[in-house]
Amino acid sequence: MLTRADLEAREAATLAPYATLSAQSRGREYPEAESATRTAFQKDRDRILHTTAFRRLEYKTQVFVNAQGDHYRTRLTHTLEVGQVARSVALTLGLNETLAEAIALAHDLGHPPFGHAGERVLDTLMAEYGVPPENTFDHNTQARRIVTRLEDRYPDFPGLNLTLETLDGLNKHDRAGLGPPSLEAQLVDAADALAYTAHDLDDGLRSGLLTPQQLETLPLWRELLARVPVQSPQLTERDRRTLHRELLGWLIEDLTTASEAAIRARGVTSAAEVRALPERLITYSAPMRELLHETGLFLREHLYRHWRVEMQVEQAARLLQTLFTAYLARPSMLPPQVRAQAELDGLPRAICDFMAGMTDRYATEMYAALVPTSGPVSWLGELRN
């Protein structure tokens, strides 16, 4: 049987000198006994996997509302894809796979129902009810709030008491004075963008909201077609899957190669040196960065702002606004634990935390119960699967 010490020794012997080692973790906010058989980052990963917040990701929107079809990505499938990409690249670069996976599994825990539409609504509502701008709503900040406080699983501390390395990896935007994060955290940021670019193109084609003819205006797509022998614009289901697989492989290869070159050029020899640098080292090649930038603009214009998606966004916004104002007007409708939290944090924050934890399905059911004359909420029916 391998002990924790054995696993830590294996890391020291096999990982790159710039990787983050479990044995060199800066610890946790609340001291606790180490596991005899798991590294510190293994404990983090396992704790995240067993949270209710993680399970709820299955029924939260990525782009398409969960009720619109069984085959579209959800926040859970997106999270798993990010974890797979992060582990794959970490293995090749000699980084700590387990730390990268832990950060990946937690990175979207703070997303509310209905994706970014839900985030915008909660942020706006919090501001309207007097919450300072720095404390309104952001899904990255909410992820940290979940793992440091809201998940109530242990008697000795609030939250999950994750290592400081995993928590730092969730500090995606608010890094004033902190410098770049670990290479593992940088990798998760890149894997996140990689995964949603590839699967949003795939889901857009599957749904019929994007067409092969539209995509042929996109430089990334034209280069992809040059790599894969398919007969565009008449794409079969197998063609679409082949293109998605090839795109993932191409992006991962570019990310791995460019990052390895950047690390080598900087000559870093420790994780501490990485954190002292002014720039990030996990990166794409310059041509790929330009292709991805153009693709992001294309997706924003043709998928995220498609009239059917915009209709879904408006439906979600009205639903969440109705729930929030109803709970604010009549707090007695809230569960007891939410009312108890309101005494500590104020009613708007408690409602925000409660609603951010809802799934698409639960929020829709609460709305139907609150406004029974509205009938079942229709999300424009199923899109093409």
From Swiss-Prot:
GO molecular function ontology, one term from the record: dGTPase activity
Keywords: Hydrolase
Protein known as: Deoxyguanosinetriphosphate triphosphohydrolase-like protein
InterPro entries tied to this protein: dGTPase (IPR006261), dGTPase-like (IPR050135), dNTPase_2 (IPR023023), HD/PDEase_dom (IPR003607), HD_domain (IPR006674), PHydrolase_assoc_dom (IPR026875)
Signal peptide annotation: none
Pfam families: HD, HD_assoc
Family: Belongs to the dGTPase family. Type 2 subfamily.
Ranges where the HD domain occurs: 75-197
Cysteine-cysteine disulfides: none
Single GO BP term: dGTP catabolic process
